[in-house]
């Protein structure tokens, strides 16, 4: 039993939806913590609003609540469940903030705060308290000023000067912060920071921009035992958020004395905070001098990286410590024979590189500052820094543009952006020196020299290739494909020369002790540490870095597939490179490979491992794109491995527009008029034949990348170039646009003979908004029984015609009563977790068993009719990305999702909106501005809002139209008509809901300004008529009902 015997039941707060600054690392941390606490015989109650996480699976905790993460709702759960303790440190910034709020509400009476004490939360998050504590214990901090109102700005400016770094209190991933170089920038960032801070507090500190950034991950228990789990150094200097920076572990550029100084400081700080559990401490370092920058008294993104980098299960150990165990009483489950008080040792180099959404958002400001913009990250492991850098860049799976103009390179290097790290290689290719590059970037010369080493080998390979040099280049992380490109040699000659890589273990102890659950990375040395069993083995490809269009949903599917296969006695191995996820946890699979997910890396593992099968269905579009190449390589090398599930050729039928159209025609299934164009000329001819507007998109891409709705030939000219560039080996797909259609998503599984439909989801936004960005609902709300029957019939016909074995997602549109098929994806989709949580059907688990050859009839699952309503709503990243067009369209923009469950649509939609931080007000002022052709559609919505007691505001045209229909509305000036206008109302917080649909190009500028202001001031906004109708239903329902707060099992039973 744990030392704290008073604990019988513990509440764990999750982190909510995936968003910039808070990604899958908390799914991993919370899932590990639940397991760790339950092992000690303590009941766990979990609350989280994210349906896409393993954490919200019914089997993760004793009770799972998928409710909005709001203090009043959690207070109600506490009343109902009466937990003895609350674990706040596993839910990221959200968990800490909510714990502080619950305490301030008086909701934690009789509930122990475990692990991270309240004082530590306040000292770590409140900038003023943190500053006082550091001064008290004699730790140096940058000169700073704390303000709580904008009127203090002049005083702060006089005291701190410029440049200055702005850090709001209680915010996530540096939200609302930044670096100010002018007084105008200072005012803008501080105003924004004050609105983002929970306590309306901002720290302005002297800039230590250009200093090295060093981090320590520290663990402490109740007996005051402290250990350093991992030291990490940021390649990017201070001024760039650590979540954005390239990070290297272990610390390599400091002397042992310098390392020792900061190690002692880190231990002193965690003791002063009295944290029991994990803590992340960040320092700025410059020529022997250092400053304490910040403390995260919780599990963080850096903790996830440190955990995967060392193999030390930080979240698991932190949870055990929080419930009273000491480090020497906790076993390290990786070795199975050493206690958790042993500091990890590493004999390799780990590199983390972030992934940004700028391929989606061309207009976003790409400058990296103290406020995060990245959506995910990859981790690579090598024996050298050089190998780590090369493997990390390969793992990103992005196009890296080569710069050949020195002036352009100097400009890119002079400010931190997502392009700077790969451009360092270009600088050395063109002969710049380490000193020149350092002067522009302030990047530690140690790392610049490593990049120069890579470039030196690259240039030698190009100019003087030898067999010895080729072998050397492999140790520096070069792929065979790169070597072929540089040398011009035949790929088979290279492969026969270098052979296969060796695989080394990550085991927390540099192989001092035998490891029970190690994971592996490839390198080019003599001794291979892999061992083989005679069990049946399957390799599953993961989904890599979280990006828009390919999020945590695919990791959820991967983990479910692993669990399902292990139940069947299969030895399951995973290939993935995302350090944040549950799939890369030490004990999820029988073996984990931390590797790039390129064809060469996959095939090397297949050749080394004697696999019976490989599964590509669960890792999203990137894994599916490898299906045909993997099958060709399997034939080439004569391997026994099979690509399991739907055949790669049938996957291609679904992607190839012409082949798929033939299949639909054979089954008499309608689809919108469409065509495939291989050239611009063909595209114009197809679009003219179909008639504008048309949807144009490349094939074989995820998240609707480069998909656009184009209205005329001029727009097509602009967009077709982008689409062709994105997918130059595949045709561009052009479809008729079905305006005002109702869009549907269907997730199903098939064994090749029978089809089980998991759920039919109705989109709340109209067709034309990417399915990943639209809210959706199960069961459907407006479809007739005949339409539902048609959709199910078409789903069965398509799945069987495609020979689907496993999962399939099909998108439909209902236009003027006709059901049209838009597309089919015979793989895991981003809605699989939502459908599983809504219905209780574990679709990914079922699919994995079917891919083994089992039949649906033997598994005993049936389609489910549910009596409740589940709504999925999305989280959009616009508050993080200034300059981005916030209007939804056919290209996906959301980063994560939430779920709302209740017994009618209105309450479920209200809960989903609340969980997505777009809470619909139940009273106040509503601003309405719609296009002329939508005025009749807004009429019933405006009337209902007025009848519900709202005051309506609008511009002249809307006011006149509503007056003609006896609905009073207050007149507001348009933006270009001068003040006071709608922007002034937003800034004064005098408007509580905006319904503003985008108009033509002339009105769009106004619309964008209004949208941006509403985002900055956190005012809920709606941009479609369909969304406005749903909001009115929510308000009506909430006026007459209260929301239901029950565990997920209550709905499934």
Curated annotation (Swiss-Prot):
Species name: Methanocorpusculum labreanum (strain ATCC 43576 / DSM 4855 / Z)
Carboxyphosphate synthetic domain: annotated segments: 1-397
This protein's name: Carbamoyl phosphate synthase large chain
Region (Allosteric domain): 920-1053
Binding site for Mn(2+) 2: 294, 296
Residues reported in the UniProt entry to bind Mn(2+) 3: 811, 823
CDD domains linked to this entry: MGS_CPS_II (cd01424)
Phylogenetic lineage: Archaea, Methanobacteriati, Methanobacteriota, Stenosarchaea group, Methanomicrobia
Cofactor: Mg(2+); Mn(2+)
